[in-house]
Amino acid sequence: MKLKFASALAVVFALAACSSEQPVTPVQEVQNVAPEVSEAPALPVSETGFSQNAEVQRFIRQQAGLGVMGEGQLQQFFAQSVYKDNIINIMNRPGTSRPWYEFRSGNAGAGKINGGRRFYQQYRQVLDQVASEYGVPAEVLVAIVGIETNYGSNMGSFRLADSLPTLAFGYPRRGEFFQQELHEFLLMAKEEGRDPFSFTGSYAGAMGMPQFMPSSYRKWAVDYDGDGQRNIWGSVPDVAASVANYLKAHGWQRGGKVMVPVSMVPTPELLALIDEKTALNKTVGELRQMGVTPLEEVADHEKAVLFRLETAPGQYDYYIGLNNFFAVWQYNHSRLYVSAVREIANGVGGGKL
């Protein structure tokens, strides 16, 4: 019976995609799909299952009202979705903070760089073509795919039709975010004409070689090879163009550096600045006046963020992140992540980003 339902659901999505004449709506224009305020708290979805959960039923009515798909099809979808306790257990694990010297070893070491060189050589023509068109160096695209999924070898095997409902209704701390991503996912399956149960990804709902969330997929994924599908799972041209499109949309500047080493005395004022939220809130000229000396040429008018990397226990190197640093940071909100992308990119491309 489940296979029958899944097959019927796939037909519904395919027909909806074929009949649609409207362009994809940018993610920021999608209505908020957070659940209505309930007079009494609903029983946990872990106890009720999706179909019997009051919050899920409100979501179904809401999505049907928005025209995502019919209420009957949504009921079928949730009847087949499986609540995954292991996903909630993963999300509830305490977070760990690693210093740069450990993060670098695990994410941007020699093995990862060598893998990036092989990946680049294998797909050099299309990677260079995408780089020329979008202005994002090929080695940066390679580095992101390398960190995210080890060049496509570990894209995740969770069905998004299980993981996203589980997080949307079983993880209250970020329930609103994941309900929005579930909304985007249902629209994505409809627009792509695919059975929603055919999509796989990480436990948190990230998909493909670049690990796009559904909202990012809908807005920035690109069908670069022209086959009618935005295939971020198996088409390197689509993957490269999608990542480049994301970075360009978030402000990547052709020919710009990512970060520059600096010389400075770590005064309380500068350490407080390092601890501030990542943002381009100072100019290089202002940082010079505060005692920060760039060790490479950079214009005073450029915006920058001051940060440090722990190279050994208690030992630090200091840097300023520039515009392109911030563009990559918006892909993953971690200064260590951006630094690892740069490390791999420099190792693959032989440059000094």
Enumerate the language-model features and the residues they cover.
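Acidic/His-rich structured neighborhood in mature extracellular/periplasmic domains
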Residues: 98-242, 248
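Flexible, glycine-rich surface segments
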Residues: 196, 200-304, 312
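C-terminal functional modules
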Residues: 304-353
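Bacterial N-terminal signal peptides that target proteins for export
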Residues: 1-7
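Bacterial signal peptide processing site
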Residues: 19-22
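C-terminal motif of bacterial Sec signal peptides marking the signal peptidase cleavage site
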Residues: 14-17
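N-terminal export signals and maturation junctions of secreted/periplasmic proteins
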Residues: 37-61, 68-121
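Solvent-exposed loop/turn segments at secondary-structure junctions
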Residues: 82, 148-152, 206, 253, ...
